[in-house]
């Protein structure tokens, strides 16, 4: 079984954690932006499935 040769330093651990959190923050920001554009109706790059009941009511 593979085991690390030496303990990972706190600096390296914190650096990796900051990278992961930064990537998560970017993904969350992008998701919020897409969600806002979808809700406001300004989204141009999405295709929505339209059910038959919605067409009958409109």
Curated annotation (Swiss-Prot):
SUPFAM superfamilies: Zn-binding ribosomal proteins. The keyword Zinc does not apply. One of its GO terms (biological process) is translation. It comes from Synechococcus sp. (strain CC9902). Residues 1-23 are annotated as: Disordered. The keyword Ribonucleoprotein applies. HAMAP family: Ribosomal_bL32 (MF_00340). One of its GO terms (cellular component) is large ribosomal subunit. Belongs to the bacterial ribosomal protein bL32 family. The gene is rpmF. It holds the Pfam family Ribosomal_L32p. Keywords: Ribonucleoprotein, Ribosomal protein. GO terms for molecular function: structural constituent of ribosome. This is Large ribosomal subunit protein bL32. Residues 1-15 have a biased composition (Basic residues). Transmembrane segments: none annotated.
